[in-house]
């Protein structure tokens, strides 16, 4: 189990993919209506501050952290490790439709950011990766592994990106926070698939930190790991 990333890399030539999100008690990732989720609006906290150290520990475990263009525009996230002493993973920004301006803070502040763009944009940053949505996520994962040697990824959003990974079955592990508070509406969170399993070898698959609960699930393809 401890070497799961290495064995998966050797077998598939793709990174180990961990999907991560936080949801309210009634199943929303963001409690704001669509008209309020506009570029520059900022993030919408779901969990309490007490959840942050574990979230940053999860980030530090992986080599890359994936975010979609819409989330980058609306939330303007930092996507680094701040609450613990550990290196931050490389940011992988998915923007195949060219929505992001080169002056965006994520690009300006992260010299080693991997910018995933459509083939018509060419190499727009020092670390560009060309990819089209129609190629599928497996093609992107193979490219990120071959070109940037990323052995593992933490996919943090947004909802569209997370659901794409789920629909294409391009994931290995899920880590989900659940808040005791309800938002009463907003942006629906993804649904953990029925074919997910508890972690093996008696490892904790759920827990509580402060008021928030967390769940860690494994894809059923790893049932014998």
Tell what function each PLM region has.
Residues 2-3:
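A gly/proline- and charged-residue-enriched helix-loop-helix capping module
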Residues 7-225:
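Enzymes that bind and transform nitrogen-containing heteroaromatic metabolites
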């Amino acid at each position: 189990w401890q070497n799961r990333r290495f064995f998966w890399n050797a077998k598939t030539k793709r990174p180990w993919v961990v999907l991560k999100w936080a949801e309210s008690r009634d199943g929303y990732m963001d409690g704001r209506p669509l008209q309020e989720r506009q570029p520059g609006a900022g993030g919408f906290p779901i969990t309490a501050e007490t959840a942050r150290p574990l979230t940053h520990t999860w980030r530090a475990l992986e080599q890359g952290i994936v975010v979609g263009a819409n989330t980058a525009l609306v939330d303007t996230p930092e996507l680094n490790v701040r609450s613990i002493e550990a290196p931050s993973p490389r940011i992988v920004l998915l923007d195949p439709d060219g929505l992001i301006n080169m002056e965006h803070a994520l690009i300006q502040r992260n010299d080693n950011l991997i910018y995933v763009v459509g083939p018509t944009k060419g190499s727009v940053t020092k670390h560009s990766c060309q990819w089209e949505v129609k190629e599928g996520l497996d093609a992107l994962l193979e490219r990120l592994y071959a070109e940037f040697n990323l052995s593992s990824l933490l996919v943090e959003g947004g909802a569209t990106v997370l659901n794409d990974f789920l629909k294409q079955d391009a994931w290995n592990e899920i880590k989900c926070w659940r808040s005791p508070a309800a938002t009463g509406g907003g942006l629906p969170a993804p649904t953990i698939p029925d074919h997910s399993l508890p972690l093996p070898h008696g490892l904790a698959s759920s827990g509580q930190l402060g008021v928030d609960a967390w769940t860690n699930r494994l894809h059923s393809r790893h049932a014998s790991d």
